C-alpha cells in the first residue's frame, strides 16, 4: 500500500530501544522542513490543526473532514511519517471507526484516540473523561476501522491530570487489552507516576505535556517511552514571524529592510523547485 513504509517506520520507532522527539507539523511547508532537518516523525496536533486550518482555539471546532484534508495535503508534500491527534474520534465509537478510515486514506502513519469528553459538556468548565467502558468501545472501534494492519492506533488518556493515578492505570490496562499498538499519556507529573504506569503496562509509551524532570531521553527510554512530545513551538514561531513582518510593513518599513526572511535558496528547497523543473523538462519540454 502507498503509505505502508511510513507506518512501518513509526512501528520501528515504537519497537526500538530509544526515545525520539517528533517535529510538530501542520501544513505542507512545515512538514517538508521537518523532513529536510532529519526528524524521524511528524506530530500533527489537534491544537495546531485548529489554529492552522481555522484560526480557532483548541475547543473541538475543526471537523474530521478538515483534519483529514489537511493530513492529505501533508502526505502529498512529504514522505515523513505523521502521528495524528484524532482527539475523541469526532463522536461516538462508530464515528471513531469512520475517523480511522478517513485518516488512513489520508496517509497518516498513526493516530491517537483519547478518552476526554469532547466537545465540552454544557455547564461544565472542567475537563471530563468518558467512562472506561466507552473508552474501551472507542479503542475497539478504532482497531476495526483500519484496513491496513500497519496503521498505528494509540489509546490516549488524560486521567493523570483529571482523576487519579489509579484511574490512569485502570484505563491504560483496559485499552492495552483491546489490542492497541501503544499508550499515550498526558498529565503525568513526576517520575514516580511514569514509573507506576510503565510497571503496570507492557506497550510502548508516548508522553505528552511532561514536566522538565521527565525530559531526560535515556531515562524516558528506560521507562518504555518511545516518543516524547515537546509542544508545538513551530506554529508559535511562525505566527510571531508573520505578525512582526506585517507590523513592520504596516509601520512603513521597506520590504528590502526586513530581517529574518527565508532565503531564496531555502524557499526553493522547501517548494521542491528543482524537482518540479525536472518534471517539467520531461513532460512539457522545459529547458533544464
From Swiss-Prot:
It holds the Pfam family PEP_mutase. Its cofactor is Mg(2+). The keyword Nucleotide-binding does not apply. Substrate binds at residues 47, 156, 232. InterPro entries: ICL/PEPM, Oxaloacetate_deCOase_bac, Pyrv/PenolPyrv_kinase-like_dom, Pyrv_kinase-like_dom_sf. Binds 1 Mg(2+) ion per subunit. Its EC number is 4.1.1.112. GO terms for molecular function: magnesium ion binding; methylisocitrate lyase activity; oxaloacetate decarboxylase activity. It is an enzyme of class 4 (lyase). It catalyses: oxaloacetate + H(+) = pyruvate + CO2. One of its GO terms (biological process) is propionate catabolic process, 2-methylcitrate cycle. CDD domains: ICL_PEPM. Mg(2+) binds at residue 85. Keywords: Decarboxylase, Lyase, Magnesium, Metal-binding. Belongs to the isocitrate lyase/PEP mutase superfamily. Oxaloacetate decarboxylase family. Homotetramer; dimer of dimers. This is Oxaloacetate decarboxylase. The lineage of its organism: Bacteria, Pseudomonadati, Pseudomonadota, Alphaproteobacteria, Hyphomicrobiales.
Amino acid at each position: 500500500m502507498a503509505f505502508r513504509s511510513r507506518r512501518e517506520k513509526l512501528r520501528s520507532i515504537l519497537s526500538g530501544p530509544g526515545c525520539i522527539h517528533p517535529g510538530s507539523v501542520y501544513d505542507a511547508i512545515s512538514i517538508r522542513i521537518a523532513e529536510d532537518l532529519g526528524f524521524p516523525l511528524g506530530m500533527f496536533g489537534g491544537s495546531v490543526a485548529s489554529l492552522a486550518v481555522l484560526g480557532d482555539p483548541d475547543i473541538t471546532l475543526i471537523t474530521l473532514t478538515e483534519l483529514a484534508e489537511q493530513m492529505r495535503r501533508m502526505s502529498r508534500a512529504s514522505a515523513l511519517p505523521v502521528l495524528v491527534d484524532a482527539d475523541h474520534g469526532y463522536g461516538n465509537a462508530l464515528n471513531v471507526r469512520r475517523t480511522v478510515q478517513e485518516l488512513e486514506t489520508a496517509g497518516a502513519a498513526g493516530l491517537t484516540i483519547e478518552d476526554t469528553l469532547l466537545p465540552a459538556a454544557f455547564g461544565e468548565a472542567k475537563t471530563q473523561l468518558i467512562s472506561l467502558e466507552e473508552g474501551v468501545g472507542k479503542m475497539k472501534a478504532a482497531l476495526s476501522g483500519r484496513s491496513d494492519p500497519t496503521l498505528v492506533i494509540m489509546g490516549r488518556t488524560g486521567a493523570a491530570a483529571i482523576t487519579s493515578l489509579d484511574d490512569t492505570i485502570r484505563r491504560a490496562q483496559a485499552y492495552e487489552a483491546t489490542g492497541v499498538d501503544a499508550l499515550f499519556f498526558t498529565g503525568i507529573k513526576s517520575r514516580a507516576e511514569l514509573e507506576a504506569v510503565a510497571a503496570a503496562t507492557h506497550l510502548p509509551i508516548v508522553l505528552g505535556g511532561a514536566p522538565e524532570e521527565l525530559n531526560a531521553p535515556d531515562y524516558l527510554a528506560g521507562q518504555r517511552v518511545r516518543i516524547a512530545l515537546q509542544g508545538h513551538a513551530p506554529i508559535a514561531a511562525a505566527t510571531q514571524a508573520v505578525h512582526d513582518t506585517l507590523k513592520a510593513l504596516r509601520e512603513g518599513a521597506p520590504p528590502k529592510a526586513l530581517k529574518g526572511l527565508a532565503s531564496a535558496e531555502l524557499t526553493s528547497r522547501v517548494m521542491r523547485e528543482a524537482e518540479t523543473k525536472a518534471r517539467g523538462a520531461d513532460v512539457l519540454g522545459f529547458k533544464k
